[in-house]
């Protein structure tokens, strides 16, 4: 088995043509970033909505995905600062303590780089981007995303789960899978808790 951090490895090599020995496997699916990168997830959802917005029989409601803005994308960055300067945002903040979070768009996981967009953080972000005037000039891979304050819980705990599959053959199709496992947050979820940042991290 070969492990590589070179994302574009598969761009320059053809599989199953003497690249590996018969017993060797490659542990990445070409193009997997379209599924695993947060910024590309946003792009794919936006493209889906644009493509099917005029087809009522398709699922074109974006409520299944929280409102997201990639701040290294000028258009989305402009939209974000227009939004947080709007009356709508002011009203949302009056009802919700933490309407947004910011996170690293790619190259980070397990909650690293994730921050609540509270008043101090919002002030820093406005200063850094000069309240939107620097959109398109700053290319940090940061995105702002609406926080889901009423998540699905198990016995009051936030959770995630992992399921692993191995495609041993495509012709005939042979797939092995493990039943998976569930990870629960140590503390029960409480949006008003003093430990609120605890619930935003992926290692809880």
Regions found by a protein language model. Give the residues of each.
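Conserved N-proximal alpha/beta basic substrate-recognition cap immediately N-terminal to
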Residues: 1-99, 106-109, 117-122
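Catalytic core of tubulin tyrosine ligase-like
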Residues: 72, 91-101, 105-204
């Amino acid at each position: 088995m070969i492990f590589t951090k070179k994302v574009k490895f598969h761009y320059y090599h053809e599989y199953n043509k003497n690249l590996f020995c018969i017993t060797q496997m490659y542990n990445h699916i070409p193009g997997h970033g379209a599924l695993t990168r947060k910024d590309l997830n946003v792009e794919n959802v936006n493209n889906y909505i644009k493509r099917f917005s005029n087809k009522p029989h398709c699922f074109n409601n974006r409520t299944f995905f929280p409102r997201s803005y990639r701040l290294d994308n000028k258009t989305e960055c402009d939209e974000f600062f227009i939004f947080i300067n709007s009356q709508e945002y002011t009203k949302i903040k009056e009802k919700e303590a933490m309407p947004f979070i910011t996170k690293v768009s790619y190259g980070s996981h397990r909650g690293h780089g994730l921050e609540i967009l509270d008043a101090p953080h919002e002030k820093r972000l406005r200063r850094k981007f000069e309240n939107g005037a620097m959109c398109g000039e700053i290319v940090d891979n940061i995105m702002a995303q609406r926080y889901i304050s009423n998540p699905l819980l198990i016995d009051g705990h936030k959770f995630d789960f992992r399921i692993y599959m191995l495609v041993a053959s495509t012709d005939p199709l042979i797939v092995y899978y493990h039943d998976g496992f569930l990870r629960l947050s140590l503390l029960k979820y409480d949006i008003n808790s003093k430990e609120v940042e605890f619930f935003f991290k992926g290692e809880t």
